Amino acid sequence: YINYKNMSHQHMLTLFNLLPVGSNISIWWNFGSMLLTCLMIQIATGFFLAIHYTANINLAFSSIIHISRDVPYGWIMQNTHAIGASLFFICIYIHIARGIYYGSYLNKEVWLSGTTLLIILMATAFFGYVLPWGQMSFWAATVITNLLTAIPYLGTTLTTWLWGGYAINDPTLTRFFALHFILPFAIISMSSIHILLLHNEGSNNPLGTNSDID
């Protein structure tokens, strides 16, 4: 009698054990690659959602309902995109916490590129939150964009420019959709720079042991 279940289990363990990573780093170093996976999922689902979305204040909410109810597998795309965004932030906060705990901020170029990534990511998430144009979307757009008015001299002009008028209206939603669509490409570019800078100097070494110790 051959226990194939145990054999497959052993093969799976072998695959993980063959991962070419030194024992001087831990599970907390997984979150960078997890973030890259999240980014790919968000771009893939976001593309299919953008095909069916309508950036108009009278039709935006209805188009979301249409995606969830009428588009084949639209509900999966919509839910994956929404929940994926939350997962993205969970991963990035753990990634940052690990960096703070183990002193990754000493690698200034990598840390500053990561900080820039976080700012772009938060902006992208905000623009995406507004897109369904429900009650909370409208409230968020009003409150957050009004913060620009706190900037001396330029505040009111900047807010009017961002809104596309003297109040939040259709032009606001259109430009928010355009920004939400274009910013992920900035995230991809910045992520590439972040990874290149990291591989240029290497990750920090919490145990202080040789990476080839295994």
Swiss-Prot record:
Q: Where does heme b b562 bind?
A: H81, H180
Q: Name one GO cellular component term.
A: mitochondrial inner membrane
The free-text cofactor remark is: Binds 2 heme b groups non-covalently.
Keyword annotations for this protein, in alphabetical order, are: Electron transport, Heme, Iron, Membrane, Metal-binding, Mitochondrion, Mitochondrion inner membrane, Respiratory chain, Transmembrane, Transmembrane helix, Transport, Ubiquinone
Highest taxon listed in the record's lineage? Eukaryota
List residues traversing the bilayer. 31-51, 75-96, 111-131, 176-196
- In this chain, a ubiquinone is annotated as bound at H199
Q: Note the subunit structure.
A: The cytochrome bc1 complex contains 3 respiratory subunits (MT-CYB, CYC1 and UQCRFS1), 2 core proteins (UQCRC1 and UQCRC2) and probably 6 low-molecular weight proteins.
* Similarity comment text for this entry: Belongs to the cytochrome b family.
Further information: Heme 1 (or BL or b562) is low-potential and absorbs at about 562 nm, and heme 2 (or BH or b566) is high-potential and absorbs at about 566 nm.
Name the PANTHER family for this protein: CYTOCHROME B
General function of this protein: Component of the ubiquinol-cytochrome c reductase complex (complex III or cytochrome b-c1 complex) that is part of the mitochondrial respiratory chain. The b-c1 complex mediates electron transfer from ubiquinol to cytochrome c. Contributes to the generation of a proton gradient across the mitochondrial membrane that is then used for ATP synthesis.
Name this protein carries in UniProt: Cytochrome b
Q: Which organism is it from?
A: Agkistrodon contortrix contortrix
Q: What is the lineage of its organism?
A: Eukaryota, Metazoa, Chordata, Craniata, Vertebrata
